[in-house]
Regions:
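Canonical tetratricopeptide repeat
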Residues: 30, 64, 97, 101-104
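Disordered inhibitory propeptide/activation segment of secreted metzincin zinc metalloprotease zymogens
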Residues: 99-159, 210, 294, 304-316
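Metzincin-family zinc-dependent endopeptidase catalytic domain
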Residues: 158-261, 269-276
Length: 316
């Protein structure tokens, strides 16, 4: 090729490349961060996309877009993480984040197809969530087969049984649960032993165990959640419903507590009325008005827990 023609080709190629507008990209990126912090994940992903259009080498925007799309569309998130990992592999400053991206791709690909109630489309941005408060203790606590089978068992008092059944029915309206009379078939089981000891004045507790079975030459394990309630107190039906709602929230994956008194995973502090203790909290709690069902924040937290493959913070 003649030198003049080669020079012209290079000029035309450079002219056709998109112009980089770093200031505009930074403005779009800041907007994306604001949306992300407001739990407006679809808007955040779009804003980060604009930042990438304005600066195709803006690695932080690729990273945060992938995080946002985890709460929008799993396949988009996988594509985003691949794009980020490919670009970051050539940048020494982003070597660790590139590894994070590759790991998240693997986890996202292994996650099952969730029931409709756990899809990101049911996340209500205006209600937000308390995922950051429970994420580290709740990671890998997702149920992967549905419906989740629950055995309430033989409840010693009729009003307690009614409260427990009401709690089950409330959660069943939101998630695919199935009541079973066979404890060995259940994923979530209740212990109504009146002689059980609760530590530190706790009203109830939830614990997870792995149950092993031998099938031929193979040993298989499955997670089982056990819920216990302090039966030494004279609970009303509504109090039992609130206790079971709360403990089932733990069993479904929320291994922590909300800081908002409107959530079922928080018990309101009061000076009067009945006082109880919540596991892991070292001061008395009491009910003045009982939360009657999981809040949208409770549901949002479950949705985010099930769709987010581990705890990472967005880039600043």
């Amino acid at each position: 090729m003649r030198p003049a023609i080669l020079a012209l080709s290079i000029f035309l190629l450079a002219a056709s490349a998109p112009a980089v507008d770093r200031e505009a990209a930074k403005a779009s990126y800041r907007q994306g961060n604001e949306f992300f912090d407001q739990s407006r994940f679809a808007d955040a992903a779009a804003a980060y996309g604009h930042a990438i259009e304005q600066d195709p080498q803006f690695l932080e925007a690729y990273y945060n877009r992938a995080l946002s799309d985890e709460m929008v569309d799993r396949q988009k998130a996988i594509a985003d993480w691949r794009q980020f990992a490919d670009l970051a592999a050539n940048s020494p400053d982003f070597k660790y984040q590139a590894g994070q991206g590759s790991a998240r791709i693997q986890i996202l690909q292994m996650l099952p197809t969730y029931p409709d109630a756990l899809q990101p489309s049911h996340y209500v941005s205006s209600a937000a969530d308390y995922y950051a408060e429970i994420a580290e203790t709740s990671e890998s606590e997702r149920w992967t087969t549905y419906p989740i089978k629950v055995a309430i068992g033989n409840v010693p008092e009729a009003n307690w049984a009614q409260g427990a059944r009401e709690a089950f029915s409330i959660w069943k309206e939101m998630l695919p649960l199935e009541l079973t009379a066979e404890p060995e078939e259940a994923d979530i089981r209740f212990n109504w032993d009146p002689d059980q000891n609760m530590e530190g004045g706790e009203v109830g507790e939830e614990m997870d165990w792995v149950q092993f079975r031998r099938e031929g030459n193979e040993l298989t394990g499955r997670k089982v959640a056990f819920i216990s309630v302090d039966l030494s107190r004279r609970w009303s039906k509504d109090e039992m419903r609130a206790i079971v709602l709360h403990e089932m929230g733990h069993a479904l994956g929320i291994k922590g507590h909300s800081l908002s008194k409107g959530d079922i995973m928080y018990f309101q502090v009061q000076e009067k009325n009945r006082q109880v203790r919540v596991p892991g909290v070292y001061y008395p709690f009491a009910w003045k008005t009982l939360v009657s069902k999981p809040s949208q924040r409770d549901l949002n937290t479950l949705i985010r827990l099930y769709n987010t493959p581990g705890v990472v913070l967005r880039m600043k």
